[in-house]
Design a protein with these regions (language model features):
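Bacterial N-terminal signal peptides that target proteins for export
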Residues: 1-11
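Subset-of-secretome marker
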Residues: 25-153
Length: 153
């Protein structure tokens, strides 16, 4: 009987340890910005520990930076690229056209998107094996090397 109580106590302690570790990582965000060639880009990463769970990109592009003169010309130019983002589970993309600029919002939910679909996304770059998740630390290094600056909270 004592052996059963010891076994139960050990099992209980192990379960509690696993639960504490699982609950230990809280979700956080980091935001980075870059202005280059008439495009203002804002990247927001949502992550737990070192694992990125979601990335949102907001790109504001003046029509002049796209080499077009009007909203209609911008729509024609960007439609083919925008169409490539549609219908992928874990990915949302939309473009809002204003009088003098287009605002693209792209959201990648890494808990839903497959690594195969992720590799198909135009303009998406990564280092290493993405099937095991996306590292926040490695993502920060990569985008900072491209000129992005972290926004202080």
């Amino acid at each position: 009987m004592k052996m059963l109580k010891k076994g139960t106590a050990v099992l209980f302690v192990m379960i509690m340890a696993v639960m504490l570790v699982a609950c230990g990582d809280k979700e956080e965000t980091k935001t980075y910005t870059l202005s280059q060639n008439g495009v203002d880009s804002k990247l927001t990463y949502t992550y737990k520990g070192d694992k990125v769970t979601k990335q949102t990109a907001e790109n504001t592009m003046s029509y002049a930076s796209l080499g077009v003169a009007s909203k209609e010309d911008a729509e024609k130019m960007l439609k083919a690229t925008s169409d490539k983002f549609q219908g992928i589970d874990g990915l949302k993309e939309k473009i809002e056209y204003k009088d003098d600029k287009a605002i693209e919002t792209l959201e990648v939910d890494y808990t839903k998107i497959s690594s195969e679909d992720m590799n198909k996304i135009p303009g998406m770059s990564s280092n290493g094996d993405t099937s095991k998740g996306i590292s926040m630390e490695e993502s920060a290094k990569m985008i900072e090397s491209q000129g992005y600056k972290e926004v202080s909270k």
